[in-house]
């Protein structure tokens, strides 16, 4: 059950960026599981990728090719093509070569992406057989269909759009994402595609998606597992009649940055809201850190704790588990007497122990809500970080126990 996640909003077409969807039947006959995306000539493309050492074959190829001329992005679901060694790389190359042959571009202009079961050979022939139908389906209006086509254990498609005006010209930013389990991106299984019709130099675009992902996709976690296949791509087609953005400054850049960051944040949080088996959307705020890293260490210690996550599922205000997680986060010379912890607006622990004003009824009322904020005040400095996560339910265990059956 997705928490606070409704139907897709209107996804505005991005001039110069087309999407086509078809069925290869990788896991189930008839399922739409191949997505082809076409970038207009002259587009800039940038991306951030998983830091998992066992990164998938398509990640290796996409990282090698992203700074060159990119015309097509090819995504398949149902098979991750990870843990497949040299045969996996050869398979990824073959699918790119087939798409290049069908579209008349160089194979190096095709970036591959895969998501699904790890360790199984990529069904190259099935994917090749579905490419022409996806090419024939290419349209700027296919964002919603593509958002569904990249899903795996997701229960709902995820996407959003932003538009702004500069010098009388409307600029569009639209993005989609997928992911519901194996989520702790570090650039789980997470894929994101964002496109704009602004014209942006590749170096500026790369910094933009790196910074945008760092404050959004890299601040979500469902189960703490970093996927072999994480990718988030940003494409600038340059079709808007505006000057090229060559520096990270100025009104046009700032407007684009805000739109891209907003899209990143919304589709990243949508992944958490649709987390496998999730019944709670949880914001973990850590304030008063001596540096940003210790805020993240504390936040992730709380967000990854199975004891806290199961208490959230049970709506049990077991505040001692939060204190224990903060204490084991590895923050050097942590003075627990300065720490305050809040559930929503309720102070549950102050100066390292139970707050004198706290009652179980107050805590239970907060924990019964679908959206919960855990706020931790460290009292060590001025740094803050925010992480978004879920509870841990019976359904999460069931989904992952039955994933390959």
Swiss-Prot record:
It is found in: Cytoplasm. GO terms for biological process: L-arginine biosynthetic process; ornithine biosynthetic process. Pathway: Amino-acid biosynthesis; L-arginine biosynthesis; L-ornithine and N-acetyl-L-glutamate from L-glutamate and N(2)-acetyl-L-ornithine (cyclic): step 1/1; Amino-acid biosynthesis; L-arginine biosynthesis; N(2)-acetyl-L-ornithine from L-glutamate: step 1/4. It comes from the Bacteria. Its EC number is 2.3.1.35, 2.3.1.1. Its main location: cytoplasm. It holds the Pfam family ArgJ. GO terms for molecular function: glutamate N-acetyltransferase activity; L-glutamate N-acetyltransferase activity. GO terms for cellular component: cytoplasm. The active site is at 189 (nucleophile). It catalyses: N(2)-acetyl-L-ornithine + L-glutamate = N-acetyl-L-glutamate + L-ornithine; L-glutamate + acetyl-CoA = N-acetyl-L-glutamate + CoA + H(+). Substrate binds at residues 152, 178, 189, 276, 400, 405. The record marks 188-189 as: Cleavage. InterPro entries: Arg_biosynth_ArgJ (IPR002813), ArgJ-like_dom_sf (IPR016117), ArgJ_beta_C (IPR042195). Keywords: Acyltransferase, Amino-acid biosynthesis, Arginine biosynthesis, Autocatalytic cleavage, Cytoplasm, Multifunctional enzyme, Transferase. The record marks 115-116 as: Involved in the stabilization of negative charge on the oxyanion by the formation of the oxyanion hole. The keyword Glycoprotein does not apply. The keyword Metal-binding does not apply. Belongs to the ArgJ family. HAMAP family: ArgJ. Catalyzes two activities which are involved in the cyclic version of arginine biosynthesis: the synthesis of N-acetylglutamate from glutamate and acetyl-CoA as the acetyl donor, and of ornithine by transacetylation between N(2)-acetylornithine and glutamate. NCBIfam families: ArgJ (TIGR00120), PRK05388.1 (NF003802). Heterotetramer of two alpha and two beta chains. This is Arginine biosynthesis bifunctional protein ArgJ. The lineage of its organism: Bacteria, Pseudomonadati, Pseudomonadota, Gammaproteobacteria, Pseudomonadales.
